[in-house]
């Protein structure tokens, strides 16, 4: 396949009718005759800005004219001084390009100047000089194209390179999938639409494991294995395993390779539901470490003291099933510790502190870094992620599971398992692969494998660190813009962005700015340990008026669910919505245009709210689905929902239900077995208190399981479910979604139930 990477020529005389313009156009024509595309530009002043687009070029040819340097060279020792405008601009361009791309060829084109006239720091970045009156344009064109081809050929990582080659070769397919490279779609009108939408390349590259030259994902051979080794090098790990069905599966693989029935496991209560599924599947006995929460509903860190071995032992002894296991085997150690790193809202831990606290208490540490795969690539996150360059080994084997599709450039479900060997023993890949095989399809999607490969290779220095720094910079610029807008409104209301009170005025500042210090009011988590936690600045929680971090409601308020519906109807989709906050991420794909659009839409919402615009005008799609709101004003609806939240003190209730005591009545695997054997009762919400759930109960937001199979319903949780029932009935379209809650229509009214273990 021929990729589109033009040769970029930047010369102010490119379109001029003089000898310099004639010479550079002759070179451009010669390059085009060799089959390459040329992009000619005349603006020298925009070089630095254009350098940011170096990812689109095969090489650069930059003009240096005699009349730009001659006034500075005459009377000197022959070298142009540092302050010559041409040198200043050229250096700025070089620095901007090399910050992102160390390898793209750069040529200088001129009349008589040579390397004697340029500083060494510029010379060392060049691939050569092109002199206008020496070699023929045809010869120079071939030389330029050769260098560009060498550069482009080296870009592709192992698996992606072979997949492109295979798709290019046009081999007839006699294996699955049945569409045979997309041909089946061409035989049907609907198939034609599908083919035109996704394109030839995706369908030709959709192959199965019969294509031996691509290697095997299940056995980690060939180009697949080479790509996994390349990713391990880039992520400073000993091993990497690509996973094509998400980090939910990566987590289950780690657990099935480590945990057996009856093992005691230490788990972050804020863990993803896939960890709780793994507990159920493996028959483990979970002992939970409890994170903090603030009144915005933002999940905070587990206090540092909870990681102390003596406190962990107290938790183990307080769990009846763990206590029973210890009675049978007093030497039983917890099998694994799984920590959510980072939380959904961006709170991360100093991992080295955790490792030091635990000592040799565990043999396996697992950090669910679904939301933190970028941390290895910027010093901002030093010690704040599981595995990194120069990090000491511990007595424990360390796993990190990454969603490369969440923060990096992977496509959906692209994930990877990253491993660091313990200091005492090497990791047994063959044993681990037995668990890998249990959870991996024998028909993996090769586009996802290629995505894992490319996403890792894109993070190679210097490009990867530059992408992460750019994300941090854009996130801080967004925060500054929001504060500027708020300041200009004076005493009037506007949205806030949750974070430290002080921001660096320019640049990305210091990571110390983002540390969660003990009792800082802004975070609302109380007396945290010093230097133990940090807020990842690329995660931004936007707070709406109506509730403060102390849990106090204002007289008026704007529930976040209304704001995010408004944004969605204006083409802006957020990641997560809470009661009075919503969450956005500054991934490596975020642009200035995107976050500036967010700022302007929030200002537009303010105007529409202040003017109490009717919902039929500002939320027409929503009103078409829920006509009961047609004549309601935007401000009126906000106040109606706010009044209900306030009357029920819902912020405090949702915080307390997660912090309330959860009584384990059965092992999760035993409770789920009751579900499988149909030994359950479908219990109405009003009768749930004291019953034992057989399922995961997960409210959205925040999407964190509230109860797991085998735990008993308490009064606080039942009160929340009663509130959700009444709220959903009163405000259709703004319903609280709770996974595990079964809705059934009885006598024209929706009633809610939960499947519980039969008494």
Question: For each predicted feature, which ranges?
Answer:
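Non-catalytic terminal extensions of PLP-dependent enzymes
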Residues: 2-5, 20, 24-33, 42-60, ...
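Short hydrophobic beta-strand segments
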Residues: 4-19, 61, 265-268
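Short loop/turn segments at strand-loop or loop-helix junctions that form parts
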Residues: 11-13, 60-68, 289-292, 542-545
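Short beta-alpha junction loops
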Residues: 13-16, 66, 108-116, 135-136, ...
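Conserved PLP-enzyme active-site core in the AAT-like
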Residues: 41-45, 50-53, 63-67, 81-82, ...
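Conserved N-terminal alpha-helix of the aminotransferase class I/II PLP-enzyme fold
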Residues: 201-249, 754
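Short active-site oxyanion
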Residues: 238-240, 262-265
């Amino acid at each position: 396949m021929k990729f589109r990477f033009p040769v970029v020529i930047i010369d102010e005389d490119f379109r001029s009718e003089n000898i310099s313009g004639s010479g550079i156009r002759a070179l451009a024509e010669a390059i085009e005759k060799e089959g390459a595309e040329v992009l000619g530009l005349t603006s020298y002043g925009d070089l630095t800005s254009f350098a940011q687009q170096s990812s689109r070029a095969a090489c650069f040819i930059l003009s240096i004219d005699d009349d730009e340097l001659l006034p500075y060279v005459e009377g000197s020792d022959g070298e142009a001084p540092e302050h010559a405008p041409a040198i200043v601009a050229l250096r700025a361009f070089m620095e901007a390009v090399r910050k992102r791309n160390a390898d793209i060829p750069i040529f200088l084109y001129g009349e008589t100047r040579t390397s004697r006239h340029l500083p060494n720091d510029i010379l060392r970045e060049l691939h050569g000089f092109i002199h206008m009156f020496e070699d023929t344009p045809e010869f120079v064109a071939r030389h330029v194209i050769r260098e560009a081809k060498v550069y482009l050929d080296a870009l592709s990582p192992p698996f992606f390179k072979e997949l492109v080659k295979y798709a290019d070769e046009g081999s007839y397919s006699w294996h699955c999938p049945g569409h045979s490279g997309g041909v089946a779609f061409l035989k049907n009108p609907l198939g034609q639409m599908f083919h035109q939408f996704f394109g030839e390349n995706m369908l030709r590259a959709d192959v199965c494991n019969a294509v031996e030259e691509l290697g095997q994902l299940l056995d980690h051979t060939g180009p697949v294995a080479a790509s996994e080794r390349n990713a391990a090098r880039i992520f400073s790990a000993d091993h990497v395993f690509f996973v094509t069905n998400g980090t939910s599966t990566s987590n289950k693989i780690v657990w099935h390779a480590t945990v057996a029935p009856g093992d005691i496991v230490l788990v972050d209560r804020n863990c993803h539901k896939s960890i709780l599924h793994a507990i159920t599947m493996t028959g483990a006995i979970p002992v939970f470490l409890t994170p903090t929460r603030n009144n915005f509903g933002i999940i905070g860190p587990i206090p540092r003291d909870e990681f102390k071995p003596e406190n962990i032992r107290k938790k183990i002894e307080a769990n009846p099933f763990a206590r029973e296991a210890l009675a049978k085997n007093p030497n039983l150690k917890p099998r694994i510790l799984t920590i959510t790193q980072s939380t959904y809202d961006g709170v991360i831990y100093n991992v080295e502190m955790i490792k030091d606290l635990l000592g040799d208490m565990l043999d396996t540490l697992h950090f669910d870094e679904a939301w933190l795969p970028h941390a290895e690539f910027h010093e901002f996150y030093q010690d704040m992620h599981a595995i990194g360059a120069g990090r000491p080994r511990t007595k424990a084997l360390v796993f990190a599971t990454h969603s490369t599709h969440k923060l990096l450039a992977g496509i959906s479900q692209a994930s990877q398992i990253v491993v660091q060997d313990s200091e005492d023993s090497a990791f047994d890949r063959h044993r681990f692969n037995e668990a890998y095989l249990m959870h991996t399809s024998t028909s993996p999607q090769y586009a996802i494998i290629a995505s894992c490969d490319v996403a890792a290779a894109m993070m190679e220095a210097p490009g990867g660190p530059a992408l992460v720094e750019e994300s941090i910079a854009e996130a801080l610029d967004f925060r500054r813009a929001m504060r500027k807008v708020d300041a200009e409104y004076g005493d009037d209301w506007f949205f806030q962005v949750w974070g430290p009170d002080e921001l660096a005025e320019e640049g990305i500042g210091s990571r110390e700015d983002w540390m969660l210090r003990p009792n800082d009011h802004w975070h609302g988590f109380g007396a945290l340990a010093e230097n133990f936690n940090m807020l990842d600045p690329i995660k931004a929680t936007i707070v709406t008026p109506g509730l403060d971090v102390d849990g106090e409601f204002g007289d008026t308020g704007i529930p976040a669910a209304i704001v995010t519906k408004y944004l969605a109807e204006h083409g802006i989709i957020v990641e997560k919505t809470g009661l009075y906050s919503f969450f956005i991420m500054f991934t490596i794909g975020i642009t200035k245009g995107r976050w500036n659009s967010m700022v302007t839409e929030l200002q537009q919402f303010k105007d529409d709210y202040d003017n109490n615009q009717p919902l039929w005008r500002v939320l027409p799609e929503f009103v078409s689905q829920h006509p009961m709101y047609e004549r309601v004003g935007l401000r009126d609806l906000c106040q109606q929902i706010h009044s209900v939240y306030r009357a029920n003190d819902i912020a405090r209730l949702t915080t307390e239900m997660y912090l309330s005591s959860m009584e384990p009545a059965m092992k999760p695997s035993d409770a789920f077995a009751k579900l499988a054997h149909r030994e359950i009762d479908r219990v109405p919400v009003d009768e749930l208190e004291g019953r034992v759930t057989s399922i995961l109960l997960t409210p959205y937001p925040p999407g964190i399981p509230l109860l797991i199979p085998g735990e008993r319903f308490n009064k606080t949780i039942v009160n929340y479910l009663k509130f959700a029932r009444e709220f959903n009935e009163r405000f259709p379209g703004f319903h609280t979604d709770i996974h595990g809650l079964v809705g059934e229509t009885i006598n024209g009214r929706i009633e809610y139930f939960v499947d519980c273990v039969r008494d």
